[in-house]
C-alpha cells in the first residue's frame, strides 16, 4: 500500500492525516513518493524536538511539490504510518528555501480533549508561540532560513485542504 497515493484525503472538515514524525522526535521522516513508505530523511542536529505529531494529507500536493503538511496537536506521540482523522483548526504560513511550505494545524477528532478546539482562537496562545518558534528556528543550525508569516483560521486551513486535493488531481 502506498500511503501517499492509496488513501483518500478525507474532507475539509475531517482530513485523513498520515503521521510521519512523532511528537518529541529528532528523526525527520518523510514519505517516499515512489514506494509510499515512510523513510528517514535526516536526524535533526539541534536541541529542539518536534513539538507535536507531524504528517501529511494523502492525495494532496502543495507549492513545495510535497503533500500538504499537517501538525497534529496530540496529547501522546503517535507512531509513523498511523492514520489519524483530524479537524483542521488553523494554518501557519511559511516560506522555506524560497517556497511556500504552509503547515495546517489540526486536532484528532477521536480525542475528546480537543472537542472544543474548532478554530485558531480555541488553540492555547502558548501552543501557537511554541509552534511558530519551532518552525522559525529548527533549521538555523544548518544555516538555512525559514520565515513564518503568521497563523490563519480554520476557514483558511480548509481552503488549503481543498486546494491541495485539486493540485494533486491536476498533477496526476
Regions found by a protein language model. Give the residues of each.
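Hydrophobic N-terminal alpha-helices or hydrophobic patches in metabolic proteins across all domains
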Residues: 1-172
